[in-house]
Protein backbone atom coordinates (compact mmCIF):
# COMPACT_ATOMS: atom_id res chain seq x y z
CA UNK A 1 0.00 0.00 0.00
CA UNK A 2 1.50 3.30 -1.15
CA UNK A 3 0.00 6.09 0.98
CA UNK A 4 -0.28 9.60 -0.45
CA UNK A 5 -0.01 12.49 2.01
CA UNK A 6 -2.19 15.57 1.72
CA UNK A 7 0.94 17.55 0.85
CA UNK A 8 1.74 15.19 -2.04
CA UNK A 9 -1.88 15.26 -3.16
CA UNK A 10 -1.50 19.01 -3.68
CA UNK A 11 1.14 18.39 -6.36
CA UNK A 12 0.21 18.01 -10.02
CA UNK A 13 0.99 14.35 -10.58
CA UNK A 14 2.63 11.17 -9.40
CA UNK A 15 5.18 10.02 -11.99
CA UNK A 16 5.05 6.25 -12.49
CA UNK A 17 8.23 4.61 -13.89
CA UNK A 18 7.53 2.20 -16.77
CA UNK A 19 9.61 -0.69 -18.11
CA UNK A 20 8.03 -2.21 -21.21
CA UNK A 21 9.27 -5.77 -20.69
CA UNK A 22 8.18 -5.87 -17.04
CA UNK A 23 5.13 -7.71 -15.73
CA UNK A 24 1.85 -5.85 -15.36
CA UNK A 25 1.15 -4.27 -11.99
CA UNK A 26 -2.50 -3.79 -10.99
CA UNK A 27 -3.04 -0.46 -9.26
CA UNK A 28 -6.17 0.45 -7.31
CA UNK A 29 -6.60 4.01 -6.07
CA UNK A 30 -8.23 3.97 -2.63
CA UNK A 31 -9.88 6.97 -0.93
CA UNK A 32 -12.01 6.90 2.23
CA UNK A 33 -11.50 3.10 2.20
CA UNK A 34 -13.22 2.80 -1.20
CA UNK A 35 -11.78 2.04 -4.63
CA UNK A 36 -12.10 5.13 -6.86
CA UNK A 37 -9.96 4.07 -9.84
CA UNK A 38 -8.12 1.01 -11.16
CA UNK A 39 -5.59 0.64 -13.94
CA UNK A 40 -2.63 -1.52 -15.04
CA UNK A 41 0.94 -0.36 -15.61
CA UNK A 42 4.26 -2.11 -16.29
CA UNK A 43 6.16 -0.74 -13.28
CA UNK A 44 9.95 -0.73 -13.72
CA UNK A 45 11.80 -3.71 -12.24
CA UNK A 46 15.47 -3.00 -13.13
CA UNK A 47 15.48 0.09 -15.39
CA UNK A 48 13.14 2.93 -16.37
CA UNK A 49 12.11 3.29 -20.03
CA UNK A 50 9.89 6.33 -19.43
CA UNK A 51 7.42 7.87 -16.98
CA UNK A 52 3.64 8.30 -17.15
CA UNK A 53 1.63 10.69 -14.95
CA UNK A 54 -1.19 9.92 -12.53
CA UNK A 55 -2.84 13.33 -12.19
CA UNK A 56 -3.88 14.29 -8.67
CA UNK A 57 -6.75 16.58 -9.74
CA UNK A 58 -8.76 13.41 -10.47
CA UNK A 59 -8.93 12.90 -6.70
CA UNK A 60 -9.52 16.49 -5.54
CA UNK A 61 -11.37 16.65 -2.22
CA UNK A 62 -10.86 12.96 -1.41
CA UNK A 63 -9.29 11.98 1.91
CA UNK A 64 -7.01 9.10 2.89
CA UNK A 65 -5.64 8.60 -0.61
CA UNK A 66 -3.51 5.48 -1.21
CA UNK A 67 -2.42 3.19 -4.03
CA UNK A 68 -2.97 -0.53 -3.57
CA UNK A 69 -0.28 -1.96 -5.88
CA UNK A 70 -0.16 -5.65 -6.84
CA UNK A 71 2.90 -6.58 -8.92
CA UNK A 72 2.37 -9.78 -10.92
CA UNK A 73 5.22 -12.27 -11.16
CA UNK A 74 6.98 -14.73 -8.87
CA UNK A 75 8.82 -12.45 -6.42
CA UNK A 76 10.15 -13.04 -2.92
CA UNK A 77 9.54 -10.24 -0.43
CA UNK A 78 13.17 -9.15 -0.86
CA UNK A 79 12.89 -9.28 -4.65
CA UNK A 80 9.72 -7.22 -4.58
CA UNK A 81 11.31 -4.59 -2.34
CA UNK A 82 14.33 -4.40 -4.66
CA UNK A 83 12.30 -3.37 -7.72
CA UNK A 84 13.50 -0.13 -9.31
CA UNK A 85 10.01 1.35 -9.39
CA UNK A 86 9.82 2.16 -5.67
CA UNK A 87 12.77 4.56 -5.59
CA UNK A 88 11.82 6.12 -8.94
CA UNK A 89 8.15 6.81 -8.19
CA UNK A 90 7.96 10.54 -7.46
CA UNK A 91 5.61 13.49 -7.18
CA UNK A 92 6.05 16.44 -9.51
CA UNK A 93 4.47 19.77 -10.35
CA UNK A 94 5.00 19.10 -14.05
CA UNK A 95 5.08 16.34 -16.66
CA UNK A 96 7.40 16.86 -19.61
CA UNK A 97 5.46 16.36 -22.86
CA UNK A 98 8.17 17.71 -25.18
CA UNK A 99 8.78 15.33 -28.05
CA UNK A 100 11.82 13.09 -27.73
CA UNK A 101 11.06 10.66 -30.58
CA UNK A 102 12.88 10.76 -33.92
CA UNK A 103 9.96 9.03 -35.62
CA UNK A 104 7.13 11.26 -34.39
CA UNK A 105 5.42 12.73 -37.49
CA UNK A 106 4.84 16.45 -38.05
CA UNK A 107 1.50 16.58 -39.89
CA UNK A 108 -0.19 13.43 -38.58
CA UNK A 109 -2.11 13.15 -35.32
CA UNK A 110 -0.29 11.24 -32.57
CA UNK A 111 -0.95 10.98 -28.82
CA UNK A 112 1.34 13.33 -26.87
CA UNK A 113 2.28 10.31 -24.75
CA UNK A 114 0.95 6.77 -24.36
CA UNK A 115 -0.62 4.25 -26.68
CA UNK A 116 -3.28 4.91 -29.34
CA UNK A 117 -5.24 2.65 -31.67
CA UNK A 118 -8.70 3.08 -33.30
CA UNK A 119 -10.09 6.54 -34.03
CA UNK A 120 -13.44 6.92 -32.24
CA UNK A 121 -16.39 9.30 -31.98
CA UNK A 122 -15.19 11.73 -34.64
CA UNK A 123 -17.42 14.76 -35.31
CA UNK A 124 -17.26 18.33 -36.63
CA UNK A 125 -18.98 21.19 -34.82
CA UNK A 126 -18.59 24.98 -34.80
CA UNK A 127 -15.43 24.96 -36.91
CA UNK A 128 -13.66 22.30 -34.83
CA UNK A 129 -12.80 18.71 -35.83
CA UNK A 130 -13.02 16.41 -32.80
CA UNK A 131 -11.07 13.16 -32.81
CA UNK A 132 -11.38 10.66 -29.96
CA UNK A 133 -9.20 7.58 -29.92
CA UNK A 134 -8.49 4.33 -28.11
CA UNK A 135 -5.92 5.46 -25.56
CA UNK A 136 -3.70 4.09 -22.80
CA UNK A 137 -2.60 7.00 -20.57
CA UNK A 138 -0.40 4.66 -18.47
CA UNK A 139 1.96 3.21 -21.07
CA UNK A 140 2.81 3.04 -24.76
CA UNK A 141 1.40 -0.45 -25.30
CA UNK A 142 -2.23 -1.58 -25.46
CA UNK A 143 -3.95 -1.53 -22.02
CA UNK A 144 -6.49 0.48 -19.94
CA UNK A 145 -8.71 1.41 -22.88
CA UNK A 146 -9.95 4.99 -22.48
CA UNK A 147 -11.15 7.64 -24.95
CA UNK A 148 -8.43 10.22 -25.55
CA UNK A 149 -9.46 13.47 -27.25
CA UNK A 150 -7.74 15.85 -29.66
CA UNK A 151 -9.10 18.80 -31.64
CA UNK A 152 -8.10 20.62 -34.82
CA UNK A 153 -9.35 23.51 -36.92
CA UNK A 154 -7.52 22.35 -40.07
CA UNK A 155 -7.29 18.51 -39.83
CA UNK A 156 -3.48 18.82 -39.87
CA UNK A 157 -2.43 20.37 -36.56
CA UNK A 158 -3.93 18.74 -33.47
CA UNK A 159 -4.17 19.72 -29.81
CA UNK A 160 -4.51 17.08 -27.08
CA UNK A 161 -7.52 17.73 -24.82
CA UNK A 162 -7.23 14.92 -22.27
CA UNK A 163 -9.19 11.72 -21.73
CA UNK A 164 -12.89 12.54 -21.20
CA UNK A 165 -14.37 9.00 -21.14
CA UNK A 166 -12.66 6.79 -18.55
CA UNK A 167 -13.13 3.12 -17.56
CA UNK A 168 -15.81 2.41 -14.96
CA UNK A 169 -17.40 -0.51 -13.12
CA UNK A 170 -19.02 -1.76 -16.36
CA UNK A 171 -15.68 -2.05 -18.15
CA UNK A 172 -12.93 -0.33 -20.06
CA UNK A 173 -13.97 1.95 -22.93
CA UNK A 174 -13.67 0.33 -26.36
CA UNK A 175 -14.47 1.88 -29.74
CA UNK A 176 -17.64 3.70 -30.72
CA UNK A 177 -19.00 6.83 -32.33
CA UNK A 178 -20.41 10.27 -31.52
CA UNK A 179 -23.09 12.37 -33.19
CA UNK A 180 -24.30 15.95 -32.95
CA UNK A 181 -27.99 15.75 -31.99
CA UNK A 182 -29.17 18.67 -34.12
CA UNK A 183 -32.75 17.41 -33.99
CA UNK A 184 -32.97 17.37 -30.19
CA UNK A 185 -34.10 13.75 -30.14
CA UNK A 186 -33.00 12.98 -26.62
CA UNK A 187 -30.47 14.85 -24.54
CA UNK A 188 -30.70 18.53 -25.44
CA UNK A 189 -30.45 20.39 -28.74
CA UNK A 190 -26.93 20.31 -30.08
CA UNK A 191 -25.78 17.78 -27.48
CA UNK A 192 -22.96 15.49 -28.52
CA UNK A 193 -23.97 11.89 -27.86
CA UNK A 194 -21.38 9.09 -27.76
CA UNK A 195 -22.08 5.38 -27.95
CA UNK A 196 -19.20 3.06 -27.06
CA UNK A 197 -18.47 -0.53 -26.11
CA UNK A 198 -18.05 -1.27 -22.41
CA UNK A 199 -15.55 -4.13 -22.26
CA UNK A 200 -16.24 -6.00 -19.04
CA UNK A 201 -16.99 -9.70 -18.63
CA UNK A 202 -19.22 -9.26 -21.68
CA UNK A 203 -19.07 -6.57 -24.35
CA UNK A 204 -22.06 -4.25 -24.00
CA UNK A 205 -22.94 -0.83 -25.43
CA UNK A 206 -23.05 2.28 -23.24
CA UNK A 207 -23.86 5.94 -23.81
CA UNK A 208 -22.42 9.26 -22.66
CA UNK A 209 -23.42 12.80 -23.61
CA UNK A 210 -21.78 16.21 -23.67
CA UNK A 211 -23.26 19.70 -23.50
CA UNK A 212 -19.91 21.50 -23.90
CA UNK A 213 -19.04 20.40 -27.47
CA UNK A 214 -17.33 17.18 -26.41
CA UNK A 215 -14.89 18.50 -23.80
CA UNK A 216 -16.54 16.56 -20.95
CA UNK A 217 -19.09 13.74 -20.95
CA UNK A 218 -21.74 12.52 -18.52
CA UNK A 219 -22.38 8.78 -18.62
CA UNK A 220 -26.04 7.78 -19.02
CA UNK A 221 -27.40 6.37 -15.77
CA UNK A 222 -29.19 3.55 -17.62
CA UNK A 223 -25.95 2.02 -19.00
CA UNK A 224 -25.44 -0.41 -20.59
CA UNK A 225 -28.21 0.23 -23.14
CA UNK A 226 -27.57 -2.78 -25.44
CA UNK A 227 -26.45 -6.17 -24.15
CA UNK A 228 -25.57 -9.53 -25.70
CA UNK A 229 -23.90 -12.84 -24.85
CA UNK A 230 -21.82 -12.80 -28.05
CA UNK A 231 -18.07 -12.48 -27.21
CA UNK A 232 -17.24 -10.00 -30.03
CA UNK A 233 -20.05 -7.44 -29.87
CA UNK A 234 -18.64 -3.96 -30.35
CA UNK A 235 -17.81 -0.68 -32.08
CA UNK A 236 -21.29 0.90 -32.54
CA UNK A 237 -21.37 3.51 -35.31
CA UNK A 238 -24.52 5.65 -35.38
CA UNK A 239 -25.74 8.30 -37.83
CA UNK A 240 -28.89 10.27 -38.65
CA UNK A 241 -30.69 8.77 -41.67
CA UNK A 242 -32.64 11.54 -43.36
CA UNK A 243 -34.38 9.00 -45.63
CA UNK A 244 -36.31 7.46 -42.72
CA UNK A 245 -36.00 10.39 -40.24
CA UNK A 246 -34.42 8.10 -37.64
CA UNK A 247 -31.06 7.22 -36.21
CA UNK A 248 -29.36 4.12 -37.55
CA UNK A 249 -26.52 2.23 -35.92
CA UNK A 250 -24.26 -0.47 -37.30
CA UNK A 251 -22.28 -2.74 -35.00
CA UNK A 252 -19.65 -5.46 -35.46
CA UNK A 253 -20.70 -8.88 -34.15
CA UNK A 254 -18.14 -11.64 -34.68
CA UNK A 255 -17.86 -11.91 -38.47
CA UNK A 256 -20.95 -9.99 -39.49
CA UNK A 257 -22.61 -6.61 -38.93
CA UNK A 258 -25.88 -5.85 -37.15
CA UNK A 259 -28.04 -2.84 -38.00
CA UNK A 260 -30.31 -1.05 -35.51
CA UNK A 261 -32.65 1.97 -35.53
CA UNK A 262 -33.73 4.48 -32.88
CA UNK A 263 -35.89 7.58 -32.41
CA UNK A 264 -34.03 8.91 -29.36
CA UNK A 265 -30.47 7.46 -29.30
CA UNK A 266 -31.34 5.51 -26.12
CA UNK A 267 -33.73 2.78 -27.25
CA UNK A 268 -32.41 0.73 -30.16
CA UNK A 269 -34.36 -1.76 -32.29
CA UNK A 270 -32.56 -4.57 -34.12
CA UNK A 271 -33.30 -4.40 -37.86
CA UNK A 272 -31.10 -6.87 -39.75
CA UNK A 273 -27.63 -8.33 -40.17
CA UNK A 274 -25.21 -8.37 -43.09
CA UNK A 275 -22.02 -10.15 -43.97
CA UNK A 276 -22.47 -13.89 -43.82
CA UNK A 277 -20.44 -15.32 -46.75
CA UNK A 278 -19.72 -11.80 -48.10
CA UNK A 279 -16.20 -10.46 -48.53
CA UNK A 280 -13.19 -11.51 -46.51
CA UNK A 281 -13.58 -13.56 -43.33
CA UNK A 282 -9.92 -14.06 -42.44
CA UNK A 283 -10.43 -12.43 -39.04
CA UNK A 284 -12.79 -10.59 -36.71
CA UNK A 285 -14.97 -7.83 -38.24
CA UNK A 286 -14.60 -4.51 -36.43
CA UNK A 287 -15.10 -0.72 -36.55
CA UNK A 288 -17.96 -0.40 -39.08
CA UNK A 289 -19.32 2.68 -40.82
CA UNK A 290 -22.23 3.14 -43.22
CA UNK A 291 -22.73 6.16 -45.48
CA UNK A 292 -24.55 7.35 -48.60
CA UNK A 293 -22.51 8.98 -51.37
CA UNK A 294 -22.89 10.12 -54.96
CA UNK A 295 -21.27 8.05 -57.71
CA UNK A 296 -18.91 10.29 -59.68
CA UNK A 297 -20.07 11.14 -63.21
CA UNK A 298 -23.54 9.59 -62.78
CA UNK A 299 -26.81 10.68 -61.22
CA UNK A 300 -26.71 7.73 -58.84
CA UNK A 301 -26.31 7.51 -55.09
CA UNK A 302 -25.10 4.39 -53.33
CA UNK A 303 -24.40 3.28 -49.77
CA UNK A 304 -20.99 2.11 -48.65
CA UNK A 305 -20.52 -0.19 -45.65
CA UNK A 306 -17.01 -0.06 -44.17
CA UNK A 307 -15.78 -3.17 -42.39
CA UNK A 308 -12.34 -3.29 -40.79
CA UNK A 309 -10.95 -6.81 -40.44
CA UNK A 310 -8.12 -8.31 -38.41
CA UNK A 311 -6.37 -10.44 -39.55
CA UNK A 312 -7.13 -11.09 -43.23
CA UNK A 313 -5.75 -7.99 -44.97
CA UNK A 314 -4.34 -8.19 -48.52
CA UNK A 315 -0.74 -7.99 -47.23
CA UNK A 316 -1.35 -9.75 -43.91
CA UNK A 317 -2.81 -8.53 -40.63
CA UNK A 318 -5.26 -5.63 -40.34
CA UNK A 319 -7.03 -3.84 -43.21
CA UNK A 320 -10.20 -2.00 -44.27
CA UNK A 321 -12.65 -3.71 -46.62
CA UNK A 322 -15.90 -2.18 -47.87
CA UNK A 323 -19.13 -3.11 -49.62
CA UNK A 324 -21.24 -1.01 -52.02
CA UNK A 325 -25.00 -1.42 -52.22
CA UNK A 326 -28.39 -0.09 -51.12
CA UNK A 327 -29.77 0.62 -47.66
CA UNK A 328 -33.40 1.43 -46.83
CA UNK A 329 -32.88 2.16 -43.14
CA UNK A 330 -33.59 -1.47 -42.28
CA UNK A 331 -31.46 -3.73 -44.48
CA UNK A 332 -28.20 -3.38 -46.43
CA UNK A 333 -28.11 -5.17 -49.81
CA UNK A 334 -24.71 -5.59 -51.45
CA UNK A 335 -24.34 -5.04 -55.21
CA UNK A 336 -21.32 -7.32 -55.63
CA UNK A 337 -21.18 -11.09 -55.58
CA UNK A 338 -20.41 -12.57 -52.13
CA UNK A 339 -16.90 -13.65 -53.14
CA UNK A 340 -15.84 -10.10 -54.16
CA UNK A 341 -13.58 -8.29 -51.67
CA UNK A 342 -12.81 -4.57 -52.06
CA UNK A 343 -10.03 -2.93 -50.05
CA UNK A 344 -9.90 0.78 -49.26
CA UNK A 345 -6.11 0.85 -48.90
CA UNK A 346 -3.58 -1.77 -49.99
CA UNK A 347 -0.77 -0.91 -47.58
CA UNK A 348 -0.07 -2.76 -44.33
CA UNK A 349 -0.77 0.22 -42.06
CA UNK A 350 -4.32 1.42 -42.60
CA UNK A 351 -6.94 0.11 -40.18
CA UNK A 352 -10.03 1.05 -38.13
CA UNK A 353 -11.10 3.59 -40.76
CA UNK A 354 -14.17 5.63 -39.83
CA UNK A 355 -15.64 9.01 -40.86
CA UNK A 356 -16.51 12.27 -39.10
CA UNK A 357 -20.14 12.94 -38.22
CA UNK A 358 -21.62 16.30 -39.23
CA UNK A 359 -18.77 17.19 -41.63
CA UNK A 360 -19.46 20.42 -43.58
CA UNK A 361 -20.87 20.53 -47.13
CA UNK A 362 -21.85 16.87 -47.12
CA UNK A 363 -18.20 15.75 -47.11
CA UNK A 364 -17.23 12.23 -46.03
CA UNK A 365 -13.91 12.73 -44.27
CA UNK A 366 -12.23 9.56 -42.98
CA UNK A 367 -9.16 8.89 -40.85
CA UNK A 368 -7.50 5.52 -40.20
CA UNK A 369 -5.20 4.14 -37.52
CA UNK A 370 -1.78 3.94 -39.15
CA UNK A 371 -0.50 0.61 -37.86
CA UNK A 372 -1.10 -3.13 -37.96
CA UNK A 373 -1.96 -5.49 -35.09
CA UNK A 374 0.87 -7.79 -36.28
CA UNK A 375 3.46 -5.40 -34.77
CA UNK A 376 1.72 -2.28 -33.40
CA UNK A 377 2.94 -2.90 -29.83
CA UNK A 378 6.55 -3.41 -30.97
CA UNK A 379 7.30 -0.49 -33.33
CA UNK A 380 10.51 1.38 -32.32
CA UNK A 381 9.02 4.31 -30.40
CA UNK A 382 8.46 4.61 -26.65
CA UNK A 383 7.12 8.02 -25.64
CA UNK A 384 4.05 7.25 -27.77
CA UNK A 385 2.89 4.51 -30.12
CA UNK A 386 0.84 4.94 -33.30
CA UNK A 387 -0.40 7.81 -35.42
CA UNK A 388 -3.37 8.40 -37.67
CA UNK A 389 -3.42 8.61 -41.45
CA UNK A 390 -3.83 11.93 -43.20
CA UNK A 391 -7.51 12.90 -43.54
CA UNK A 392 -9.07 11.59 -46.74
CA UNK A 393 -12.26 12.58 -48.53
CA UNK A 394 -14.24 9.55 -49.69
CA UNK A 395 -16.45 9.18 -52.75
CA UNK A 396 -17.53 6.56 -55.29
CA UNK A 397 -16.56 5.83 -58.91
CA UNK A 398 -17.40 3.16 -61.50
CA UNK A 399 -14.90 0.99 -63.36
CA UNK A 400 -15.73 -1.95 -65.64
CA UNK A 401 -19.22 -2.38 -64.22
CA UNK A 402 -18.24 -2.25 -60.53
CA UNK A 403 -18.52 0.64 -58.09
CA UNK A 404 -15.46 1.42 -55.95
CA UNK A 405 -14.56 3.80 -53.15
CA UNK A 406 -12.47 6.79 -54.19
CA UNK A 407 -9.96 8.07 -51.63
CA UNK A 408 -8.31 11.48 -52.10
CA UNK A 409 -6.23 13.57 -49.70
CA UNK A 410 -8.55 16.06 -48.01
CA UNK A 411 -8.21 19.62 -49.40
CA UNK A 412 -6.76 20.65 -46.04
CA UNK A 413 -3.60 18.74 -47.01
CA UNK A 414 -3.16 20.92 -50.11
CA UNK A 415 -3.70 24.03 -47.97
CA UNK A 416 -0.90 22.88 -45.63
CA UNK A 417 1.74 22.86 -48.40
CA UNK A 418 4.61 25.34 -48.50
CA UNK A 419 4.03 28.10 -51.07
CA UNK A 420 7.07 27.11 -53.14
CA UNK A 421 7.78 23.69 -54.57
CA UNK A 422 11.27 22.29 -55.04
CA UNK A 423 13.17 19.07 -55.69
CA UNK A 424 14.66 18.56 -52.23
CA UNK A 425 13.30 15.65 -50.21
CA UNK A 426 12.71 16.49 -46.54
CA UNK A 427 11.57 14.34 -43.61
CA UNK A 428 8.01 15.76 -43.73
CA UNK A 429 6.73 16.68 -47.18
CA UNK A 430 4.38 15.94 -50.07
CA UNK A 431 5.85 14.72 -53.34
CA UNK A 432 3.62 15.23 -56.40
CA UNK A 433 4.57 13.05 -59.38
CA UNK A 434 2.98 13.61 -62.81
CA UNK A 435 3.12 10.33 -64.71
CA UNK A 436 2.98 9.35 -68.38
CA UNK A 437 3.22 5.58 -68.25
CA UNK A 438 5.43 3.26 -66.21
CA UNK A 439 7.55 4.74 -63.43
CA UNK A 440 9.81 3.63 -60.57
CA UNK A 441 10.22 6.05 -57.67
CA UNK A 442 12.96 5.41 -55.10
CA UNK A 443 13.41 7.25 -51.80
CA UNK A 444 16.77 6.57 -50.14
CA UNK A 445 19.36 7.76 -47.62
CA UNK A 446 23.15 7.45 -47.36
CA UNK A 447 22.79 4.39 -45.09
CA UNK A 448 21.60 2.32 -48.06
CA UNK A 449 18.02 2.27 -46.76
CA UNK A 450 15.33 2.76 -49.38
CA UNK A 451 11.69 2.45 -50.36
CA UNK A 452 10.91 1.58 -53.98
CA UNK A 453 7.52 2.38 -55.54
CA UNK A 454 6.63 0.96 -58.94
CA UNK A 455 3.74 1.89 -61.24
CA UNK A 456 2.97 -0.53 -64.09
CA UNK A 457 0.53 1.21 -66.45
CA UNK A 458 -0.20 -1.85 -68.59
CA UNK A 459 -0.86 -4.18 -65.66
CA UNK A 460 -2.72 -1.37 -63.83
CA UNK A 461 -0.83 -2.00 -60.59
CA UNK A 462 1.14 0.03 -58.06
CA UNK A 463 3.54 -1.48 -55.53
CA UNK A 464 5.67 -0.31 -52.61
CA UNK A 465 8.71 -2.25 -51.38
CA UNK A 466 9.81 -1.53 -47.82
CA UNK A 467 12.02 -4.61 -47.39
CA UNK A 468 15.13 -2.37 -47.17
CA UNK A 469 13.41 0.66 -45.60
CA UNK A 470 15.31 0.79 -42.28
CA UNK A 471 14.63 -0.79 -38.89
CA UNK A 472 12.63 -3.98 -39.22
CA UNK A 473 14.02 -6.32 -36.57
CA UNK A 474 11.11 -5.70 -34.18
CA UNK A 475 8.79 -8.01 -36.18
CA UNK A 476 9.06 -10.79 -38.76
CA UNK A 477 5.85 -9.44 -40.33
CA UNK A 478 7.13 -5.92 -41.07
CA UNK A 479 9.24 -6.38 -44.23
CA UNK A 480 6.79 -6.41 -47.14
CA UNK A 481 6.06 -5.52 -50.74
CA UNK A 482 2.48 -4.25 -50.94
CA UNK A 483 0.63 -4.21 -54.26
CA UNK A 484 -2.61 -2.52 -55.39
CA UNK A 485 -4.82 -2.43 -58.49
CA UNK A 486 -5.13 1.10 -59.95
CA UNK A 487 -8.47 0.66 -61.81
CA UNK A 488 -7.18 2.50 -64.89
CA UNK A 489 -4.28 4.87 -65.45
CA UNK A 490 -2.67 7.08 -62.82
CA UNK A 491 -1.70 10.49 -64.19
CA UNK A 492 -0.74 12.08 -60.87
CA UNK A 493 0.56 10.44 -57.71
CA UNK A 494 0.55 12.25 -54.37
CA UNK A 495 3.07 10.82 -51.89
CA UNK A 496 3.01 12.02 -48.28
CA UNK A 497 6.24 11.36 -46.37
CA UNK A 498 6.31 12.13 -42.65
CA UNK A 499 9.24 10.77 -40.60
CA UNK A 500 7.91 7.22 -40.22
CA UNK A 501 5.17 6.83 -42.82
CA UNK A 502 4.63 6.92 -46.58
CA UNK A 503 1.13 7.33 -48.01
CA UNK A 504 0.82 7.09 -51.80
CA UNK A 505 -2.53 8.13 -53.30
CA UNK A 506 -3.74 8.53 -56.85
CA UNK A 507 -4.80 12.19 -57.15
CA UNK A 508 -8.00 10.94 -58.79
CA UNK A 509 -8.80 8.66 -55.84
CA UNK A 510 -8.55 5.25 -57.50
CA UNK A 511 -5.71 3.86 -55.34
CA UNK A 512 -4.25 4.41 -51.90
CA UNK A 513 -1.41 2.68 -50.07
CA UNK A 514 -0.22 3.42 -46.52
CA UNK A 515 2.96 1.97 -45.02
CA UNK A 516 5.09 2.70 -41.98
CA UNK A 517 8.88 2.97 -42.35
CA UNK A 518 11.63 3.45 -39.76
CA UNK A 519 14.79 4.66 -41.54
CA UNK A 520 17.80 5.23 -39.27
CA UNK A 521 18.19 8.62 -40.99
CA UNK A 522 15.51 10.45 -43.03
CA UNK A 523 15.38 9.68 -46.75
CA UNK A 524 17.07 12.58 -48.55
CA UNK A 525 17.41 11.36 -52.14
CA UNK A 526 14.77 10.81 -54.85
CA UNK A 527 15.12 9.07 -58.19
CA UNK A 528 12.29 8.77 -60.71
CA UNK A 529 12.81 6.36 -63.61
CA UNK A 530 10.35 6.52 -66.50
CA UNK A 531 8.26 9.39 -67.82
CA UNK A 532 7.57 11.30 -64.64
CA UNK A 533 8.16 14.81 -63.34
CA UNK A 534 7.98 15.60 -59.67
CA UNK A 535 7.75 18.52 -57.26
CA UNK A 536 8.14 18.50 -53.50
CA UNK A 537 6.25 20.69 -51.03
CA UNK A 538 7.23 21.03 -47.39
CA UNK A 539 4.46 20.54 -44.84
CA UNK A 540 4.92 21.98 -41.36
Segments predicted by a language model, with ranges:
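Acidic, glycine-rich loop-and-beta core segments that form the ion-binding/anion-interacting portion
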Residues: 293-295, 303, 311, 315-329
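Aromatic-lined carbohydrate-binding/catalytic grooves of carbohydrate-active enzymes
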Residues: 111, 126-155, 168
